[in-house]
Amino acid sequence: MQLSGYPMRQASCDMKEGGLRNKVAVIGSGSWGTAIANLLCKAGNETILWGRDENVIDEINNARVNSKYLPGVELFLRATCDLDYAVADASHVYIALPSFALSKVLPKLSLDKFSIVISLIKCLEPDTGRRMSEVISEALDLGHNRLAVISGPNLALEVANDEPSVSVVASANIATANIVAGTLKCPGFYCIPSSDIKGVEICAASKNLVALISGIARGMDLGDNTRAALITLGFRELLRLVLENGGTEETVFGVAGLGDVVATCNSHLSRNNKAGVLLAKGAPLDEVKQTAEGVVAISGVLALAERSGVYMPIAQALSQVISGKRTAHSLLDICFSLA
């Protein structure tokens, strides 16, 4: 589909002046990792995608698709199961792994001393509440100028299908954010550099809870009025958590905060939204956990809230629903008692 004002991207890696701009590695061959790797390739970077599943990697290399995680999308990149090969000489390394996989993969990364590492992970570390950039920084011994995160309304299938999208690239060093944004420069994909890495990461994790609540309301066949009220109440807790931890209102009410909440709560592509529907319908917890990482990562949000003295009764009640200690109906009662 051709959108007026948004030219479709080239069906191959664009050659810029002086050749390909950067050697880029993406670690993680799930839907978002594959989508961002394909985008980076289209933006003119020499891109290689790493994954553990040999069947997925072989399919990407031979059939140019990832039918398991991103069906129906033609891919223009190379993929490998060799981690050392993937990151060799890479100037930028994107991390698109589930949070539970970091402890297994990060120690194996052998990076160039000037490599910039970019987190695509939208959660906080379970039980500790540490931001993913903090976890990565400690594991790889990286300074702030070599760390960045990307967040926003980033539904992988829409990005992969060239739907116009806006994301925030955040780093404590704004120069780093600008450098990373440059590697992603591509028609239809727009990046806003930011130095509010704390706010962006906390928004990314907390919005999962809002989406779960929205999904629960949807799964209970409640109307849009109810769902809108629940989203607003959940968003209010997100706002308090971000501001108390040094984030800014500009981030919360921008695409990394409000924008991500709108997309995640309203799209049928949102896994956290789907997980909320499953919770409302009484699906087994294992099935819900497999649907979205946000279900597991709620403990990280609550840990950060406790550490920073932020009262989040809706998040606490949601955690009890997930653990089976509370019904979805009682969650609604708590939400509306706070209105």
UniProtKB/Swiss-Prot annotation:
Residues reported to bind sn-glycerol 3-phosphate: 122, 152, 207, 260, 270-272
Q: Subcellular localization, per the record?
A: Cytoplasm
A GO molecular function term, named singly, is: NAD binding
**What catalytic reaction does the record list?**
sn-glycerol 3-phosphate + NAD(+) = dihydroxyacetone phosphate + NADH + H(+); sn-glycerol 3-phosphate + NADP(+) = dihydroxyacetone phosphate + NADPH + H(+)
GO cellular component terms attached to this protein's record: cytosol
Query: Catalytic positions?
Result: 207
Q: Which GO terms describe its biological process?
A: carbohydrate metabolic process; glycerol-3-phosphate biosynthetic process; glycerol-3-phosphate catabolic process; glycerophospholipid metabolic process; phospholipid biosynthetic process
Q: Which SUPFAM superfamilies match?
A: 6-phosphogluconate dehydrogenase C-terminal domain-like, NAD(P)-binding Rossmann-fold domains
EC numbers listed for it are 1.1.1.94
Role: Catalyzes the reduction of the glycolytic intermediate dihydroxyacetone phosphate (DHAP) to sn-glycerol 3-phosphate (G3P), the key precursor for phospholipid synthesis.
Report the pathway entry.
Answer: Membrane lipid metabolism; glycerophospholipid metabolism
Q: Which residues bind NADPH?
A: 31-32, 52, 122, 156, 271, 293
Gene name of this polypeptide: gpsA
Keywords attached to this entry = Cytoplasm, Lipid biosynthesis, Lipid metabolism, NAD, NADP, Nucleotide-binding, Oxidoreductase, Phospholipid biosynthesis, Phospholipid metabolism
Q: Which Pfam families match?
A: NAD_Gly3P_dh_C (PF07479), NAD_Gly3P_dh_N (PF01210)
Q: Give the domain of life.
A: Bacteria
- According to its UniProt entry, this protein's organism is Tropheryma whipplei (strain Twist)
Name of the molecule in the record? Glycerol-3-phosphate dehydrogenase [NAD(P)+]
Q: What lineage does the source organism belong to?
A: Bacteria, Bacillati, Actinomycetota, Actinomycetes, Micrococcales
EC class (word): oxidoreductase
Return the similarity comment: Belongs to the NAD-dependent glycerol-3-phosphate dehydrogenase family.
